[in-house]
């Protein structure tokens, strides 16, 4: 057991699940979008829906979408800061069958018109699980440098991506593969030990059959490089 698991994260309260985890869900969604969102539909499920307002979950998710970290003292003011930043958001509730009680579904549109749907759960102690991206099941927590590759489900893409990582001395900690249907749309999620350089993202983005590439460097918390 890690010390973090006992003490929990440094955060603005009141709850690690409803506040710190919610900030991280919003922040990860922003990073996956690859740019500042201009509109956000925020849908709360389960415990988030029942007690989220009293625990500040709504403000925490908006704070994350603005790029704040869980210990940011501005989290309680995120609604007014969103207005200043030009972020138009709505907050509602949803019933998600089989989802964790602390789950949020975020539908985002970025300043360039790019769209993204992310489902994330706060699983305790400020930890999160990103369980869907654009309707495709995923399973990662944002605790590593993470490479997310969207591609056509055709042979060779896994080898291309892993070769590009190996050529740069980047070790893969975990790798998960998901697809909509055989020959359809696929997503790779690779958690890595080393940071993901710009050159890697650029190279992968230029490969035939690869639709979108996102690199999340967790050492920098908010750094992201994304291309479509």
Where are these regions (language model features)?
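Non-transmembrane, aqueous-exposed alpha-helical and coiled segments at domain scale
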Residues: 30-41
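A structural-propensity feature for long, helix-poor, extended segments
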Residues: 41-84
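Short glycine/threonine-rich loop-to-helix capping motif typified by GTGT followed
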Residues: 51-59, 101-103, 186-194
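Protein-protein interaction/assembly regions in multi-subunit complexes
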Residues: 25, 67-70, 75-76, 84-86, ...
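A conserved regulatory-domain signal marking ACT and ACT-like small-molecule sensing domains
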Residues: 91, 119-228
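Short, hydrophobic/aliphatic alpha-helical segments
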Residues: 1-10, 40-43
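Contiguous domain-boundary segments centered on the initiation and propagation of an alpha-helix
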Residues: 66-116
């Amino acid at each position: 057991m890690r010390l973090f698991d006992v003490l929990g994260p440094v955060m603005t309260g009141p709850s690690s699940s409803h506040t710190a985890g919610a900030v991280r869900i919003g922040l990860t969604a922003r990073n996956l979008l690859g740019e500042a969102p201009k509109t956000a539909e925020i849908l709360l499920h389960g415990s988030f829906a029942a007690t989220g307002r009293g625990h500040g979950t709504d403000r925490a998710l908006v704070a994350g979408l603005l790029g704040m970290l869980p210990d940011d003292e501005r989290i309680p003011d995120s609604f007014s800061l969103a207005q200043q930043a030009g972020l138009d958001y709505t907050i509602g509730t949803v019933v998600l069958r089989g989802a964790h009680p602390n789950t949020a579904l975020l539908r985002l549109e970025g300043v360039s018109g790019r769209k993204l749907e992310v489902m994330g759960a706060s699983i305790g102690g400020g930890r999160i699980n990103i369980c869907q991206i654009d309707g495709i099941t995923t399973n990662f927590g944002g605790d590593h440098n993470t490479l997310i590759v969207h591609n056509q489900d055709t042979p060779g893409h896994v080898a291309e991506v892993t070769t590009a990582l190996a050529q740069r001395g980047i070790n893969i900690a975990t790798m998960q593969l998901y697809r909509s249907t055989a020959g359809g749309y696929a997503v790779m999620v690779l958690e890595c030990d080393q940071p993901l350089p710009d050159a890697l993202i650029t190279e992968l983005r230029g490969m035939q059959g690869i639709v979108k590439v996102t690199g999340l460097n967790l050492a920098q918390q908010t750094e992201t490089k994304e291309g479509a």
